[in-house]
């Protein structure tokens, strides 16, 4: 009887095992068999970490308290205003495409920014009124444009554009009261990168950066009256890093980053009248990789990459 009962139990277990359904799932890369399904609660908990948004500082609000940030809300990054620490962000732009570079008017609330459509990389420059969120396209709508830089008076924007021939990175100057009357101030002689770095205090000259490669860059000054350009940083027939940063307070010199005087990228100052160079960070044995100067050009801060830490 016991033997009979044991046999029945064994047959019952075997039949139960064979009756169990084999779970198979194909996710496109792996075929999973008899792997337990992932509970929905785990997916929900994971989404809190996968959907964390970052925010990038874009500039201070010149007309009121707060600052502008860009952060993803929906599918693309847009511009927002945060009026105080811990305050709610107020969305300013509502485009289907992400905004690119952003630069604030020196005295007013207007903002110039770049944006392309459909990933074409033919970015256009727009003027934004943050109070009404209204925008105006300033460029032609077809060429590739970038690097908008306000003049100190705020009535012109220097920018890079391919509008002359569709490929060359020329530098132009745009009057805000008539953007269609943009004026070519530097015609690119080659396919390298050219762009405006700073305006002189009286807006009569523009500091121009020419990036050729990671090991070769030069800087020029363009006189806006004569349209003549003068090479001031770097040698015509040799390679070195010369990243133009800004004019000084009295337009007598240029701050720049260079590797000409040591093994590191150093912060230096070039005096225009004498061509004398003073290395500011010569006692720092690390690369200088960031710089910002105050609006009145009286103070500046720079960043050093110290053993991988900024």
Regions found by a protein language model. Name each.
Residues 4-13:
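Sec-dependent N-terminal signal peptides
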Residues 17-19:
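Boundary at the C-terminal end of the N-terminal hydrophobic targeting segment
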Residues 31-55, 86-89:
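A short helix->beta-strand "capping" segment at the edge of beta-propeller domains
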Residues 51-70, 89, 96-114, 125, ...:
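Conserved beta-propeller blade repeats
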Residues 80, 217-222, 266-270, 310:
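Beta-strand-rich binding/interaction modules
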Residues 83-87, 129-133, 175-179, 223-227, ...:
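Short loop/turn segments that connect beta-strands within beta-propeller blades
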Residues 303-310:
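Short, intrinsically disordered, charge-balanced linker/junction segments flanking boundaries
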């Amino acid at each position: 009887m016991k033997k009979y009962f044991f046999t029945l139990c064994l047959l019952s277990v075997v039949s139960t095992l064979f009756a169990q359904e084999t779970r198979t799932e194909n996710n496109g890369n792996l075929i999973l068999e008899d792997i337990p399904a992932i509970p929905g609660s785990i997916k929900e908990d994971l989404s809190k970490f996968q959907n964390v948004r970052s925010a990038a500082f874009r500039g201070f609000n010149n007309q009121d308290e707060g600052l502008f940030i860009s952060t993803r809300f929906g599918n693309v990054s847009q511009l927002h205003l945060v009026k105080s620490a811990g305050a709610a962000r107020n969305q300013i732009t509502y485009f289907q495409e992400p905004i690119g570079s952003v630069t604030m008017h020196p005295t007013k609330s207007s903002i110039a920014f770049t944006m392309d459509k459909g990933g074409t990389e033919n970015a256009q420059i727009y003027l934004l009124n943050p109070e009404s969120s209204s925008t105006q396209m300033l460029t032609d709508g077809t060429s590739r444009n970038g690097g908008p830089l306000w003049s100190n008076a705020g009535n012109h924007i220097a920018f890079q554009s391919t509008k002359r021939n569709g490929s060359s990175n020329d530098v132009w100057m745009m009057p805000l009261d008539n953007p269609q009357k943009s004026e070519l101030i530097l015609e690119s002689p080659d396919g390298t990168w050219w762009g405006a770095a700073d305006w002189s205090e009286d807006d009569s000259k523009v500091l121009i950066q020419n990036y050729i490669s990671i090991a070769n860059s030069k800087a020029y000054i363009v006189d806006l009256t004569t349209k003549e350009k003068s090479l001031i940083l770097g040698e015509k027939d040799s390679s070195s890093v010369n990243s133009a940063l800004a004019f000084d307070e009295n337009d007598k010199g240029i701050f720049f980053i260079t590797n000409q005087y040591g093994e590191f990228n150093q912060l230096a100052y070039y005096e225009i009248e004498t061509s004398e160079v003073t290395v500011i960070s010569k006692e720092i044995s690390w690369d200088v990789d960031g710089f910002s100067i105050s609006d009145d050009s009286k103070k500046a801060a720079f960043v050093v990459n110290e053993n991988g830490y900024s």
